[in-house]
Structure formats: structure tokens, C-alpha cells
Amino acid sequence: MSASSTAHSPLMSSEQIMNLLPHRYPFALVDRVLEHEPGKRAVAIKNITLNEPQFQGHFPGRPLMPGVLIVEAMAQVGGLIVTQMPDLPKGLFVFAGIDGVRFRRPVVPGDQLRITCELLSLKRQRFGKVRAQATVDGELVCSGELMFSLVD
């Protein structure tokens, strides 16, 4: 059974997220956690606002969320899955690969990304793979598999 929250009471506050993930402005891309099963899956949101620095140059007059930042947001939600697994060594998990990532629609200021990640595999407590997808208003924006590795 998963832990979940209502729209008014997040499962994890921004402070709790910052205690679990090393990312900081401008790369802290998880605003709220809605569901979390350590070692299994997580669902979180990222609110897209015009005040974000990438929109100064991507693109003036037609701001679009860069695809690499959507993938990074998905990876950070994937990171929340493993950060509370008691048997894993502590350290920094980083990207090791990306498979089958596809972008299906633009993301613009005012959108709210709903990101769902599910752990697919974990090998030797150092290498893992998650299936990730991001939606806006129920419409698929991006999906793919993300691999990570523990850096000593």
C-alpha cells in the first residue's frame, strides 16, 4: 500500500525533499511529493513558472521547458525512491544512461508536471534503473528509462 497525500498536505515538504536530494537552485526540480514507496515508486510534481532562469534564453517570446530539464526532474524523483532504502550505501547517485526517452508535447510556464517513477532494477547496490513518465493534465509529456550509478 502506498503512502499518499491530498492536494493540500504533501507527503513530503520542500524542506524534506531538500534533506533527501543534493540539488539546489536552479536545479531543485521537485516541488512536492504526492506518493512515495521507498525502494519501489514515487509520484511528485514540478510547477513550471515563468520566473525560472532557463526561460530567459529558451526561448525569448515563446518559453519552452528544455527537454533535458524534464528528464532531470524525472531523475530527481527517481532519486527519491532510493534515498531512503536502508541497505544502500550513502553517496551520490548520478546518471549512467538514458533509454527510450521520448518527448510528446511542449511544457510551458503555468504547466504542472506530474512525474511518476518506478524502480525496475538495482544491481550490487550501485547501479539502478527506473521507468519514468511525466504528464501535464493527464497528457503524456515525456517517458523513458533512466539508469543511475553510485559515485564513490
Swiss-Prot record:
Reactions catalysed according to its record: a (3R)-hydroxyacyl-[ACP] = a (2E)-enoyl-[ACP] + H2O
GO-annotated biological processes: fatty acid biosynthetic process; lipid A biosynthetic process
Pfam families: FabA
Compartment(s) of residence: Cytoplasm
Keyword Cell inner membrane: no
Top-tier EC class: lyase
Function: Involved in unsaturated fatty acids biosynthesis. Catalyzes the dehydration of short chain beta-hydroxyacyl-ACPs and long chain saturated and unsaturated beta-hydroxyacyl-ACPs.
Record family assignment: Belongs to the thioester dehydratase family. FabZ subfamily.
Protein name as it appears in the record: 3-hydroxyacyl-[acyl-carrier-protein] dehydratase FabZ
Provenance organism: Synechococcus sp. (strain RCC307)
Gene it is expressed from: fabZ
